[in-house]
Structure formats: structure tokens, C-alpha cells
């Protein structure tokens, strides 16, 4: 929310981009945040202690500081490009291991956390859109910077290298988070190895969207075989009417089913 509203809308003062940034910011604070807050309410975690706990967790606190440091600069075209490129990867890769972990409870015959799965689908669809929009901003600005001669070939190479290095840092961060998920042992139906390779695939997608080549190319990625199915497919809302998207389903219609 803060990045779209306070960075993108100020750095890109075009009305159409500002409308996009405002819409994305609203989705984060007006749709996703209430959903996750509702989960916390059901779990009894909607309290100040829980919402500030990340500050006392060295791993999570360092990640938040790293993100803030990497995307805050706006003094040059180069730094704006780097910021938007990194943020596009953050939107398209960070949290996806958590998305996959939660979604697996509703796959492969488990059929648990139905409401949570629906909300995660909304988040994954929106985060993917936000990532792709950020990548479009990056490519457009880079093309214009090249045409206007405000970025050199050497800077273009450096930019690519910095963004590729960032994917490796993101993977390291995600690996630590994934390790926390399995601190108390293995979980039937999903593994840390599967989640790591899924994050690698997400980072490759982000690089491709930015106009760069893949660097991870995981050959073992079973999560992808089921993760995207209910994100991309239509569902039958009414046998006698038509098909539509589950995105229109309201998770507040009923109680959470575990």
C-alpha cells in the first residue's frame, strides 16, 4: 500500500498510472488486510502483541529493513528503475511460499481451509497483477531512458546484475521463512524442497517479466502443477446460467471452515 501510494504515484505523475497505483493500494489495505485480519480474529491473534511481533523476530525484522532500504531511493532514473524492478519481484515472489503452503491444505485430497484458500487465491491473483504492472512500468521507463540517452550501456548491465543478485537474496530470505514453517517437523503433502523450487520458479517469472533471462530453471516444481489451477480457471456458478471467476466470491458469506 505504502509503495504504490507514496512512491509510484509520486514518481510517475501520469493520471493513468496514479489511478492504477491508487487502485492497487486500495486492494492491499481495503481487501487483503481485512481478510487476513479476519483470520487472525478467528485464531485469537488480533492484538497489538501479535501485529508487532515481527519487530522482535530478527529474520522478519531484517527482511522488512532490507525491503525498505532497497526500494526507497528515487533520486536518479537508475535508482527508480532499480526500485521498481525490485518491488516487482517482491510482489511476484515474496509470500508465494506462504501462499503455496496454505493452499496445499485444500489440494491433493486434504480439502481443509476452504475459506482461507479462497482468500489466498484473491491475494495471489492481485499480487501477480501488481508484479506484472510493476514490470511494465520498469520496461517502459527503461526503454524511454535508453531512447533519451539517460542510462548508459554499462548502467544497463549493472542494473541487470543488481536485479539478478536481488533474486538470490530474496531466495535466501524465503528459504529462512520456509525453514521456520518446518521447524517442528515434516508436513504430509508438501516439503521445504518443493517450496524452495516454487519460489525459484516465481523469481524466474519475475525476471522474464522484467525482460531478463531465467537464472534458476528448476526442473522439479510439483507445486506449480496445482497452485495455478484455481487461479486461472473459470468455475461453474450456476448450472443454468454461466461460468465465471471465483474472484467474485465473498469470503465473508459464512464462517471460516477449517
Residue spans for each PLM region:
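Non-heme di-metal
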Residues: 1-258
Amino acid at each position: 500500500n505504502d509503495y504504490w501510494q507514496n512512491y509510484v504515484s509520486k514518481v510517475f505523475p501520469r493520471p493513468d498510472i496514479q489511478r492504477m497505483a491508487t487502485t492497487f493500494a486500495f486492494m492491499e489495505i481495503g481487501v487483503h488486510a481485512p481478510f487476513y485480519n479476519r483470520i487472525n480474529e478467528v485464531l485469537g491473534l488480533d492484538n497489538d502483541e501479535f501485529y508487532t511481533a515481527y519487530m522482535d523476530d530478527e529474520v522478519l525484522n531484517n527482511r522488512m529493513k532490507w525491503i525498505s532500504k532497497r526500494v526507497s531511493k528515487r533520486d536518479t532514473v537508475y535508482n527508480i528503475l532499480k526500485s521498481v524492478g525490485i518491488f516487482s519481484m517482491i510482489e511476484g515472489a515474496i509470500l508465494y511460499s506462504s501462499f503455496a503452503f496454505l493452499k496445499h491444505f485444500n489440494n491433493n485430497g486434504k480439502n481443509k481451509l476452504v475459506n482461507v484458500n479462497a482468500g489466498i487465491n484473491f491475494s495471489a491473483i492481485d499480487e501477480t497483477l501488481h508484479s506484472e504492472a510493476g514490470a511494465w512500468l520498469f520496461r517502459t521507463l527503461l526503454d524511454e531512458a535508453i531512447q533519451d540517452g539517460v542510462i548508459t550501456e554499462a548502467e544497463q548491465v549493472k542494473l541487470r546484475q543488481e536485479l539478478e543478485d536481488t533474486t538470490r537474496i530474496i531466495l535466501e530470505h524465503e528459504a529462512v521463512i520456509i525453514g521456520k514453517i518446518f521447524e517442528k517437523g515434516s508436513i504430509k503433502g508438501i516439503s521445504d524442497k518443493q517450496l524452495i523450487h516454487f519460489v525459484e520458479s516465481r523469481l524466474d517469472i519475475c525476471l522474464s517479466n522484467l525482460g531478463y533471462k531465467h537464472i534458476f530453471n528448476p526442473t522439479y516444481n510439483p507445486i506449480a502443477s496445482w497452485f495455478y489451477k484455481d487461479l486461472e480457471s473459470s468455475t461453474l456458478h450456476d448450472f443454468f446460467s454461466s461460468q465465471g471467476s471465483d474472484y467474485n466470491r465473498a469470503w465473508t458469506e459464512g464462517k471460516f471452515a477449517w
